[in-house]
């Protein structure tokens, strides 16, 4: 679980407006932060299949949000990908 201070910082960095917490950009950024925090856990605990299911669910949700954003506004999609460093 990410700390509330880190979560607030991620929201502030990716918000489109002052109180924006629900835009696809913010949701993708929060999921990315959670995924990046969980990744080292699975390097150490390779047999944690129950936790891995949750991780894969987060990755799938992020993928769907990115697909939605790409369909709605490709410029915002490319800016977000570059900002978060998701695509190689």
Swiss-Prot record:
Gene3D superfamilies: 6.10.250.3130, S15/NS1, RNA-binding. It holds the Pfam family Ribosomal_S15. Transmembrane segments: none annotated. GO terms for cellular component: cytosolic small ribosomal subunit. The keyword Cell membrane does not apply. GO terms for molecular function: rRNA binding; structural constituent of ribosome. Disulfide bonds: none annotated. One of the primary rRNA binding proteins, it binds directly to 16S rRNA where it helps nucleate assembly of the platform of the 30S subunit by binding and bridging several RNA helices of the 16S rRNA. Belongs to the universal ribosomal protein uS15 family. Part of the 30S ribosomal subunit. Forms a bridge to the 50S subunit in the 70S ribosome, contacting the 23S rRNA. This is Small ribosomal subunit protein uS15. It comes from Paracidovorax citrulli (strain AAC00-1). The lineage of its organism: Bacteria, Pseudomonadati, Pseudomonadota, Betaproteobacteria, Burkholderiales. The gene is rpsO.
């Amino acid at each position: 679980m990410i700390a509330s201070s880190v979560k607030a910082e991620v929201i502030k960095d990716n918000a489109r407006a002052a109180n924006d917490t629900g835009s696809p950009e913010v949701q993708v950024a929060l999921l990315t932060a959670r995924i990046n925090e969980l990744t080292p856990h699975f390097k150490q605990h390779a047999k944690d299949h129950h936790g891995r299911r949750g991780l894969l669910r987060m990755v799938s949700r992020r993928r769907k949000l990115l697909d939605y954003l790409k369909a709605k506004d490709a410029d915002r999609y490319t800016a977000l990908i570059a900002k978060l460093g998701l695509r190689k």
